[in-house]
Structure formats: C-alpha cells, structure tokens
C-alpha cells in the first residue's frame, strides 16, 4: 500500500487526490493523509508563477515533515488576470509531475474584492451567502451551479500531473 501525503488539510483537495490516484492506478491501494504546510507565497497568489511556486513549496515542506511517504502532492489555487485556476505538483523519490487545472472566469465584482486583498473563498462566501465555500465545492461549484466542483476540476488536473508516473518509460527521472 502506497502512502500519499497531500500538502493541505482541505477536504476538497484530499478527496481530489484520492480519486485521481484511484483512477490512475486502479490496481493499487493507497492511504491518503492531508497535512497543513506553508506555501511560502501570498494567501491569494496573483499570477501563474507564484501559484506554481506555492504548490512546489507545499511539496517541499510536506517532505520535511513526513519523509516516509511514497508520493507528495501540492495543490495551490491562484488568480491570473480575470481567471482562477490551480497548479498540481506530484513528487516521489525519483519523479515530478506538474499540471494546471482549467481556468474559471471570475465576475468583475469578485476581482475587485480580490484586488482589495480579500481571498477568493471569502469573496464567494459573501457573494453567495455561504460559509467555507473553499472547503466544499469552491468558486467552481458556486459559479457553475454545482455542475462542476473544485474537487472534480482538480481531479482532472491531478491525473494529468500523474502522466509521468503512469508512463515512466517515456519520462526520464528528474
């Protein structure tokens, strides 16, 4: 059984990781554990590079806390222009996979509040009169009338980040 450390305590992220690994490797068993670690970037990254750095830093910091895992997964959501998205970073002892999720357009009112320093999750809570949207379906669920969720969109990007692990013969070790 392989041990996966998710560099987040967010249930939506942990669920997405568990689903992605189960789909990518249906013949294997996994234990999935979420731990809180620093991203070392702003709470709301405001460009693609900062968002990717946050995901990489989460993996780096998770490895320091739990050196015995088989896989480490960092997910970091960010804003770039008028869109929100997330970077996925997956590492084991010899390989790294990275992928970016689909981009979701944000309403102008949300972007204005984000520019004032308010996190997207808090903006969504306010706009939709909800609590803790970011740990449930996220902005994605709210803006798609629950057609998609944060977890479902992240799951697809995680499977893409797993490509080097699913096709080791085509991806030299880093």
Curated annotation (Swiss-Prot):
Protein name per the record: Inosine/xanthosine triphosphatase
Main EC class the enzyme belongs to: hydrolase
Family per record: Belongs to the YjjX NTPase family.
EC number(s) on file: 3.6.1.73
Residues passing through the membrane, by range: none
Cofactor(s) needed: Mg(2+); Mn(2+)
Record key words, sorted: Hydrolase, Magnesium, Manganese, Metal-binding, Nucleotide metabolism, Nucleotide-binding
Binding-site residues, substrate: 68-69
Molecular function (Gene Ontology), one example: ITPase activity
SUPFAM superfamilies on file: ITPase-like (SSF52972)
Function of the molecule: Phosphatase that hydrolyzes non-canonical purine nucleotides such as XTP and ITP to their respective diphosphate derivatives. Probably excludes non-canonical purines from DNA/RNA precursor pool, thus preventing their incorporation into DNA/RNA and avoiding chromosomal lesions.
Highest taxon of source: Bacteria
GO biological process: nucleotide metabolic process; thiamine metabolic process
InterPro entries the record matches: ITPase-like_fam, Non_canon_purine_NTPase, NTPase/PRRC1, YjjX_NTPase
Binding site for Mg(2+): 68
Subunit composition and interactions: Homodimer.
Cofactor note: Binds 1 divalent metal cation per subunit; can use either Mg(2+) or Mn(2+).
Catalytic function, reaction form: XTP + H2O = XDP + phosphate + H(+); ITP + H2O = IDP + phosphate + H(+)
């Amino acid at each position: 059984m392989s041990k996966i450390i998710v560099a987040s305590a967010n249930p939506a992220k942990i669920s997405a990781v568990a689903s992605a690994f189960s789909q990518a490797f249906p013949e294997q068993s996994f234990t999935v554990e979420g731990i809180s670690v620093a991203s070392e970037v702003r709470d709301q990254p405001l460009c693609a590079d900062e968002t990717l750095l946050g995901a990489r830093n989460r993996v780096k910091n998770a490895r320091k806390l739990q050196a015995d895992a088989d896989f480490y997964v960092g997910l970091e959501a960010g804003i770039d222009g008028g869109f929100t998205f997330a970077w996925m970073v997956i590492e084991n002892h010899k390989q790294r996979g990275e992928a970016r999720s689909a981009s979701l357009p944000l309403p102008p009112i949300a972007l204005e509040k984000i520019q004032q320093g308010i996190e997207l999750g808090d903006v969504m809570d306010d706009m939709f009169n909800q609590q803790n949207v970011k740990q449930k379906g996220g902005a994605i669920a709210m803006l798609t009338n629950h057609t998609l969720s944060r977890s479902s969109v992240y799951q697809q990007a995680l499977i893409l980040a797993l490509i080097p692990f699913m096709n080791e013969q085509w991806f030299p070790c880093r």
